[in-house]
Amino acid sequence: MTELNRVVAHFTDGKLLKGTTQDFFPNRPRFHLQPAAGGAPVEVRCRSLKALFFVKEFVGNASRRDLRGFLNSPGETAQGKKIAVRFKDGELLCGYSLSYLPDREGFFMFPSDSGSNNLRIYVIAAATVEVKAGPSADVLAQKVLATRPE
């Protein structure tokens, strides 16, 4: 039996779609998403995505503030090496990845904030402007966060 995953699809045009999927595989160009609001399944083309967030719940805690950057996180964990991702829309994600390779179409990462509603995130490389792994991930995160108010 295939696992049912709760996901939030973030599209490059800014649209969000919440639902479940059983057929997402990183090596396939499309998958089906059953909208949380009901209705017929939607075919999602990966090239139209910014990222696919695998979440604990569809309704997050609105009063919770996500931790910014890496704080005092170790350089490497069981979830991989530090990675900082800056998207074309300016969003910064910090976390860990076991599977990042610069020439791939995408990669999985785990959030650096263990209290996050996100379990893991599949990042579409074409939606990024900068990805840094290892010690340079800290440098990128600090650079981007220094230009933003808390």
Regions found by a protein language model. Give the residues of each.
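Conserved RNA-binding domains used in RNP assembly and mRNA/RNA metabolism
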Residues: M1-E150
